[in-house]
Amino acid sequence: MATSPSSCDCLVGVPTGPTLASTCGGSAFMLFMGLLEVFIRSQCDLEDPCGRASTRFRSEPDYEYDFIVIGGGSAGSVVASRLSEVPQWKVLLIEAGGDEPVGAQIPSMFLNFIGSDIDYRYNTEPERMACLSSMEQRCYWPRGKVLGGTSVMNGMMYIRGNREDYDDWAAQGNPGWSYQDVLPFFKKSEDNLELDAVGTEYHAKGGLLPVGKFPYNPPLSYALLKAGEEMGFSVQDLNGQNSTGFMIAQMTARNGIRYSSARAFLRPARMRNNLHILLNTTVTKVLIHPGTKNVVGVEVSDQFGSMRKILVKKEVIVSGGAVNSPQILLLSGVGPKEDLQKVNVRPVHHLPGVGKNLHNHVAYFTNFFIDDADTAPLNWATAMEYLLFRDGLMSGTGISDVTAKMATRWADRPNLPDLQLYFGGYLASCARTGQVGELLSNNSRAIQIFPAVLNPKSRGYITLRSADPLDPPRIFANYLTDERDVKTLVEGIKFAIRLSQTSPLKQYGMRLDKTVVKGCESHAFASDAYWECAVRQNTGPENHQAGSCKMGPSHDPMAVVNHELRVHGVRGLRVMDTSIMPKVTAGNTHAPAVMIAEKGAYLLKRAWGAKVURVDATWTLHRVI
């Protein structure tokens, strides 16, 4: 157990970002959360006033840099950190948001910051076939507007996807992206805290990103594993040899503390004089010479609306994620010519695939009740257990770190997982009463199982709303427009119900919530037709958006970048984030985003003559800058 230090070696600054109390809405629990935040800010390993990258924050950028990285999120933080390892390169990282709030370091509070000031709070355009019960039939897309991006507010689950995901990328004309090619870059970043348990063939120690299990899991977590075994599944590392089964996942955390990409990669680089960071600054466009199509710099707007141009010597890297990366390219005049002209953006380079191929995992929240009167409340006793020892309810995410992957009859290939189960409940957050998994009127508690489609067939796209860079883009998700996605979800729901009927979960009195979904009253409850209706009414988009700047060869009309992540037809411009995925990986996308950034930084170093890492036949990556 980790005991936090009692004093810091430097002054604690002003609070950054939304507070825990402000994220609790009108809850009567706000006073407790406000006091809790005071105690949290006195904990040096949580507040980390000495370790934050604030020494690199700049109010005024220099005139010119070797590299400019747009977006300090899950991938951009990694790219900037790795490029600044070369001391003769001057690197600028530009982030539209501010620094990460201290409350986000607490695992149990991970849902608090969705919808807060560090969230872009995107909504899709009205959906035809999904989110039908939502206001105006719009799906909500939380995306991090903060240093560290969505890794500051995600569930922290470290999932790499299937081996076949990457082999398929390579087979589509992207050499260097097979599973064997990318595994060293997963291992490069990884500091696995349980290496003896998972082995060295697929995992490594010594990287910047801590990966390990939370200190605490509710007893129900282990019952879920037993339930999976009763149904014939193994409990195993889904990032290893096999990707089918159940597990308590490893997380991007250490000692009960979240490690965002900013905390893991930028804070260790904070003393490098060649790394500068601009916060609260929006890139309005990448500056591209219309004749040569060479990138010359970027145009930015600070939080007060002041505009300036910053020049680049070598390359600009766009790492805004699957929503903002295509938006930045479009604002820069790179994209479908006809779409740009509609919003009065001057086309610089016609590239029809920008914003296309957008897709995301899609889920359905299946509600259950359990009988459990022994759960402890979130009170000062449990808070002190976390503050003093980084253990207990607040050191984890309840049962949300349990997951399972499996193949349905709709899978493209036998035994290739196309469905993932997530679980929700026992979350120590700001509930109405302060009780973890609050008691309902019948003395039961609610938990959720939500199956997610890992290989969605439905495709959407992103376009500009206007030429104003502060206008959110128009997002057409087109969820469930391919019937195969609906069929896979229904299979997942029926599996979740069967799981609830196993003996380990029957001991909890687990039972399906039979409240009829509004709009589905005409269907027999729990029939396939009923569930097909339900998933369209109460659609649950995951936060794993991908594909909108697709990687592919030049003969692919929808490809935006090549296998070296260079934007087709533009010199000095690359994209490095999940938007380059030809097809989204089968699982949470944070670990693949970090891998893409690691490989992208490697490609940049190699292209510009820096010493680079060598990959040997055993897939070991030797760390040489």
Curated annotation (Swiss-Prot):
Coiled coil stretches, renumbered: none
Binding, FAD: 66-95
Signal peptide start and end residues: 1-42
Keywords on record: FAD, Flavoprotein, Oxidoreductase, Secreted, Selenocysteine, Signal
Flavoprotein in keyword set: yes
Primary localization: secreted
Cofactor section: FAD
Enzyme class, first EC level, given as a word: oxidoreductase
Molecular function terms from GO: flavin adenine dinucleotide binding; glucose dehydrogenase (FAD, quinone) activity
Cell compartment(s), UniProt: Secreted
Catalyses which reaction(s): a quinone + D-glucose = D-glucono-1,5-lactone + a quinol
Residues the record marks as active site: 544 (proton acceptor)
EC number of this enzyme: 1.1.5.9
Segments traversing the membrane: none
Family under the similarity heading: Belongs to the GMC oxidoreductase family.
Protein name per UniProt: Glucose dehydrogenase [FAD, quinone]
Taxonomic source organism: Drosophila pseudoobscura pseudoobscura (Fruit fly)
Lineage, uppermost ranks: Eukaryota, Metazoa, Ecdysozoa, Arthropoda, Hexapoda
